[in-house]
């Protein structure tokens, strides 16, 4: 019987298959790297802002509630960047309107009235042109996220934003990736607390497992994991 031999063109085909496999494998590896590497998903993103607003000072040392500035977070999908008038409550006045030197006046705030760092705030109050802040936490394209739903279901600001009250300059602490969101939706209980405590970033319950379980049951937390929840 005559021996069978593959035609010579098979050699080229074999090389083509190997090259295709390497190309596809490299592409998939690159996609995986892009999906999980902190530098790609913006973990640590810490842009400079037109006004060096310190959350460590305002939310930490002074104890301002998150909702004083982000006042739509309980009723709207977006947390909202505060209007300059909110800054003006403390920083928009001048010394002539103060009831006591160096302290806020009755109608206009005069805290740090001559600080050059706050000049963009004073300019904005005078011209009505908004201060152009740089976004820190940017979701991927075509993703829907509703702040009010999460806040009212007992998810604390700290779960997504970290200890903002300890940040001199705000930075992104979590990847905000699909996997990260799904991990919580599949097992939300450890992140659920009394809605009255969502802005208390330092809060630690005495018996975490029991506490979170009780509040998850009380609030009826059963998040969906279907695609349409986030992609609408």
Predicted stretch roles:
Residues 49, 83-86, 139-141, 180, ...:
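Residues that flank catalytic or metal-binding motifs in active/ligand-binding sites
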Residues 135-137:
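Membrane-interface loops
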Residues 65-132:
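Membrane-embedded segments
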Residues 139-141, 146-191:
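Soluble extracytoplasmic domains of inner/organellar membrane proteins
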